[in-house]
Regions:
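Catalytic-core regions of glycoside hydrolase
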Residues: 1-105
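Sequence-level motif detector for i,i+2 pairs with an aromatic at +2
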Residues: 33, 67-69, 375, 388, ...
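Short, Φ-rich (hydrophobic/aromatic) sequence segments
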Residues: 85-96, 197, 201, 311, ...
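Catalytic domains of carbohydrate-active enzymes that cleave complex glycans
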Residues: 102-274
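Mature N-terminal, pre-catalytic/accessory segment of carbohydrate-active enzymes
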Residues: 209-287, 364-369, 389, 395-427, ...
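Aromatic, loop-rich ligand-recognition surfaces of beta-strand-rich domains
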Residues: 292-352, 361-404, 425-456
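Beta-propeller fold detector
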Residues: 355-357
């Protein structure tokens, strides 16, 4: 009430990154007794530095007037040239709010920035829009992806054509983009984007072999060739794109084919468990980060936790559960992103849940062993708590395999890692540096070794 009326007050919205809406402005304006100056935290990426946001500018209400907001400022990325596409949209919005159209403005911005490489830049930009967590943005809206079980020849061919376009984008941008400063900023992402195009295209070609079902050897060889190495993943994680549809298609396609292929060989359900939960991203490939046998990676909810939320594992079949090990938090035992009041439960049908342990309080490391319980699903469920942080899990192991539980004799130079050769899960492997000796159980009629390559 006593603040000089000429002083403008910045406001970032309901949360740090949020839309500009009449409701937001009404809330703050009624308290500061003047139209606020809106500080929009977009396209800033200081919370996701491995992304470079190139999508349309939307989330800015077109009914607002100077009576509601006295100004709008955009917080850009540290990449000045790459921020210009979003800044073009923000300027367009503030110039003529009532008639602003996000897609039309975006199309004009692409043309202004790269007049001789617009098509290539557009292909990259439309697939480099989402943040993967937090302030989510639409991405790849013109592209239809699918699971292998939903295969349709026409849809598959259309997606393959898109991946082939993506594969060519880096070279086309190098040739046609006259803004060398923009090209320099985008180049690391363009490089990884092109690789995504290649592995996506090859996943579709691999699926055609898989669906024919008559050439296991050819499928396996091409499957191994199209896997991402540790180095590939590190490079992609550093400069991500296509996170909403394209990379998930690749991951899901490879996983679905691996599951079906191994099930065919085993005659039983493989043990390639899936992450599940109550959060919006619980069904995405992000949950694989708590199942990758690497405690330096983690699954995170990406939104604040609330009572009743849970994180768990689908064992794909009803199994005897005798051991569970969970590491909560992102990277340490003093992290804030965890359930500080929780209970460990299991279920055969996903509806009726049975507690396995008493209520847990402020426990990052959770271990349970007991008599066999028939279950397909295991979960850690949040109970009443004041905590509103994200929830993160570094590791969620159910029935972790131990050498002594294999049922046959085994000798190797690395007893801790060798179990991954026998865990019925194609996402894991064991690298033989010297020799591997194992007993073939009595009554075994066939034995199949799935290998990457042999060095003689």
């Amino acid at each position: 009430n006593s603040l000089n009326p000429d002083i403008k007050v910045f406001w970032t919205g309901d949360v740090v990154c949020s839309d500009l809406t009449p409701e937001t402005m009404e809330w703050i304006n009624s308290r500061i007794k003047r139209p606020a100056y809106y500080w929009w935290n977009y396209p800033v990426t200081d919370y996701i530095r491995n992304f470079i946001l190139q999508g349309p500018v939307y989330g800015l209400d077109t009914s607002l007037t100077k009576e509601n907001v006295c100004g709008v400022v955009s917080n850009p990325m540290e990449h000045g040239e790459a921020s210009k596409l979003a800044l073009y949209g923000v300027a367009d919005y503030t110039w003529n709010i009532a008639n602003y159209n996000p897609i039309d403005s975006w199309e004009r911005g692409l043309q202004e920035l790269t007049p001789k490489a617009k098509d290539a830049y557009r292909t990259f930009a439309i697939h480099s829009s989402d943040t993967e967590n937090g302030y989510r943005r639409d991405e790849s809206w013109e592209t239809k992806t699918f699971r292998i079980a939903e295969w349709n020849d026409a849809t598959a061919q259309a997606l393959k054509t898109e991946f082939e376009k993506i594969e060519k984008v880096p070279a086309e941008m190098e040739q046609g983009c006259e803004n060398k400063a923009l090209l320099q900023e985008l180049r690391p992402w363009l490089t990884e984007f092109g690789k995504l195009g290649t592995r996506g295209k090859q996943a579709i070609e691999l699926a055609q072999i898989y669906r024919s079902g008559n050439d296991d050897s050819s499928f396996w060889n091409k499957y191994v060739q199209n896997l991402m190495s540790k180095e590939d993943r590190k490079a992609y994680e550093a400069h991500k794109s296509g996170t909403l549809k394209l990379q998930p298609f690749y991951e899901n396609a490879m996983d679905d084919m691996a599951h079906g292929f191994l099930k065919k060989l085993l005659g039983t359900t493989p043990k390639d468990y899936k992450g599940i939960g109550s959060f919006g991203n619980s069904g995405t490939i992000l949950t694989k980060l708590m199942l990758d046998n690497d405690t330096t990676t983690y699954y995170t909810s990406g939104i604040g936790q609330k009572e009743g939320d849970w994180i768990g594992v689908d064992l794909r079949d009803i199994r005897d559960v005798t051991e569970i090990s969970i590491l909560q938090g992102r990277n340490s035992v003093d992290d804030v992103d965890y359930f500080d009041h929780a209970i460990l439960e299991c279920s055969a049908d996903g509806k009726t849940w049975t507690p396995l342990i008493k209520e847990l309080n402020k426990q990052y490391v959770i271990n349970w062993k007991g008599d066999a319980v028939k279950a397909r699903y295991v979960r850690l469920k949040r109970l009443e708590s004041e905590r509103k942080n994200y929830a993160s899990v570094r590791s969620f192991e159910v029935n972790p395999l131990h050498v002594e539980n294999l049922g046959f004799k085994l000798e190797s130079e690395n007893p801790q890692q060798v179990v991954y050769a026998f865990d019925q899960n194609l996402s894991t492997f064991y690298k033989v540096s010297n020799t591997l000796t194992f007993e073939v159980p009595q009554g075994t009629k066939t034995y199949t070794l799935l290998m990457d390559k042999l060095s003689v």
